[in-house]
């Protein structure tokens, strides 16, 4: 009788709380007792009553429990519950219930969304969350009538992860689209039970795919930032008044990635710095993206054109070809420990180039731009791609080639070094030698401006 009265006091006390409230301890009552049945009207038992807790040496009864007040039990999930095999520490065996509490909605996003792979009448939206989540993108030509896109692989929605990649397909070139990313925390993902937490929705961002056959665009190219935030921000100040359509990071920007956290931090720095939620970015590999423990995982943060680290695409009537030079030393160099085979990658791109130079998209393009990190011309060291690629490229009618790697700005007009097209090499990560390239296509003209971190013009090609 006294126990039942104490239960009423407990219920009254619990009702005054607005947050999850837990009750744990020796109830001195078995699961079938009137007391436990009455308790369960207001409390949800989280421990497993089928696992006995008393007496500790050889348990035969369940009289210890962990329970949650039902009125406020929505902000968590039970991950596991067990009675610990500890027969001597007490006359009761300990109970352990592992809970996962819900994150606040305003803490769910780790990064802002950033746009990738704006080809084939589509756009990829990527972002990260602080917790495993079920995610989707809401998008449309206005913010009142929205479609929903998710990533579905082999019939299953990709979820319960933190790095998110969702493709928006069948978009209209030249049409402005609005979108926002949505992430609902997944507290529990089991075979027959899912528990969801709060939902976060980003602010609306917008983007526009290029009009098919457009003859004008502006692009910005960075290189060799080597995770130097100060240098990057100084260069961004020089382009803040430029209305650019896409951005290329031409290698050694997210260098030597040691961990997911390190990569995420600087990728966010880069994408936010160039308004990557509205402007698509292309991340190309330099030799330093290939190094360190997280180098293989780095590709998960991007959506490469054709799912390769090299490729080609059209921006209007201009063809852009991107190559991956791999490392700057031979595969048998001791520092690689026989874990590299860039010879295969370079040979693979020979086949790619032969096909690329023969397709109508390349042949009929009004202008053709080549990008790769390590220069074939003007490089202090040996370019391991030269023997494979030079003869193919010297026959191709490229209008400009943009390179990096040497950490020293240089411009080599056509023919100066035996090059069959003009070559521009970007500067390095030190503020005094850093550069940013502005690529401008207007009707029949293709121009490149190179600025330093002070805003001084180093080159204005015609």
Q: Model-found features: residue ranges?
A:
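His/acidic metal-ligating clusters that form di-metal
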Residues: 2-40, 133-135, 242-246, 273-280, ...
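Conserved beta-sheet core of the metallophosphoesterase superfamily
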Residues: 36-68, 164, 380-444
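Active-site regions of metal-assisted phosphoester/phosphodiester hydrolases
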Residues: 1-106, 187-190, 212, 353
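Conserved, compact domain cores that house catalytic/ligand-binding motifs in diverse enzymes
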Residues: 215-293
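Active-site environment of divalent metal-dependent phosphoester hydrolases
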Residues: 27-34, 53-61, 227-233, 255-259, ...
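Acidic, histidine-bearing metal-coordination/catalytic regions of metal-dependent phosphoesterases
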Residues: 72, 90-93, 98-221, 240-242, ...
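Active-site-proximal beta-strand elements of phosphoester/diester hydrolases
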Residues: 1, 216-226, 317-327, 369-373, ...
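Extended active-site neighborhood of metal-dependent phosphoesterases/phosphodiesterases
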Residues: 182-206, 261-358, 388-397, 410-429, ...
């Amino acid at each position: 009788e006294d126990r039942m009265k104490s239960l009423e006091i407990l219920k009254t006390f619990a009702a005054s709380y607005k947050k999850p409230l837990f009750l744990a301890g020796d109830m001195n009552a078995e699961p079938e007792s009137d007391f436990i049945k009455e308790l369960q009207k207001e409390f949800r038992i989280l421990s497993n009553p089928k696992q006995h807790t008393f007496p500790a040496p050889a348990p035969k009864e369940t009289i210890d429990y962990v329970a949650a007040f039902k009125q406020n039990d929505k902000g968590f999930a039970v991950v596991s519950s067990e009675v610990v095999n500890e027969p001597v520490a007490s006359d009761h065996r300990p109970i352990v219930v592992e809970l996962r509490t819900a994150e606040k909605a305003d803490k769910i996003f780790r990064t802002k969304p950033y746009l990738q792979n704006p080809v084939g009448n589509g756009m990829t939206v990527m972002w990260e969350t602080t917790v495993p989540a079920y995610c989707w993108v809401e998008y449309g030509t206005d913010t009142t009538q929205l479609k929903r896109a998710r990533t579905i692989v082999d019939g299953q929605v990709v979820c319960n992860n933190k790095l998110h990649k969702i493709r928006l397909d069948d978009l209209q070139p030249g049409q402005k689209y609005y979108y926002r990313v949505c992430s609902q925390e997944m507290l529990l993902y089991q075979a027959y039970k899912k528990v969801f937490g709060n939902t976060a929705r980003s602010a609306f961002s917008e983007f526009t795919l290029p009009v098919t056959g457009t003859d004008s665009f502006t692009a910005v190219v960075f290189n060799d930032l080597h995770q130097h935030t100060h240098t990057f921000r100084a260069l961004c100040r020089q382009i803040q008044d430029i209305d650019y359509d896409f951005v290329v990071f031409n290698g050694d920007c997210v260098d030597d990635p040691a961990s997911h956290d390190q990569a995420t931090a600087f990728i966010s720095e880069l994408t936010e710095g160039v308004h990557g939620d509205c402007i698509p970015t292309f991340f190309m590999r330099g030799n330093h993206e290939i190094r360190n423990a997280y180098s293989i995982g780095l590709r998960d943060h991007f959506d490469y054109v054709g799912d390769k680290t090299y490729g080609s695409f059209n921006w209007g009537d201009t063809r852009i070809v991107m190559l991956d030079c791999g490392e700057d030393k031979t595969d048998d160099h001791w520092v690689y420990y026989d874990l590299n085979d860039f010879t295969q990658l370079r040979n693979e791109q020979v086949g790619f180039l032969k096909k690329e130079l023969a397709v109508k998209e390349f042949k009929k393009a009004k202008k053709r731009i080549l990008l790769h990190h390590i220069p074939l011309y003007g490089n202090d060291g040996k370019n391991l791609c030269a023997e494979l690629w030079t003869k193919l490229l010297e026959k191709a009618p490229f209008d400009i080639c943009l390179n990096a790697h040497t950490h020293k700005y240089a411009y080599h007009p056509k023919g100066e070094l035996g090059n069959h097209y003009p070559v521009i090499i970007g500067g390095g990560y030190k503020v005094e030698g850093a550069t940013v390239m502005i690529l401008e296509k207007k009707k029949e003209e293709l121009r490149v401006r190179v600025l330093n971190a002070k805003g001084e013009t180093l080159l204005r090609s015609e």
